[in-house]
């Protein structure tokens, strides 16, 4: 989804440590295929001093029109803040799309699945991803992840994960389908 020169903006502060190397925040990942290695820029907006979403800062930054993706980390990760609620996610998505309709809103939904009646894509998020090991896999599934959302964006992700032309038509299951369904 992100290409060289694009800007990814985290609106829930700096993401948890395990994703630093994916983004390229962790300088030890330099040269290993991070987003930064491919010329994607990363910015973030801190939460307020009360650990709330800074909607004014989001509107101001996204309103400049150069943000390709707004990133929401739903889980608190290793911090002491609260998890981001579906209502907060909806407000971020609505605000983002009102000031910049083409900006992609993406939610890292790890640990957020099945915790509320709606999921991020039900409230305006364009793309969501998470682990099949945690909530959906019931700690039974030994591996796996998912990507859901707008068809064109899911297709782009599938082509990046596998190979252009094949996309989501192929992929490893490692004989784990039974465990995955047991977890669900």
Model-derived features with residue positions:
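Conserved PLP-enzyme active-site core in the AAT-like
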Residues: 1-184
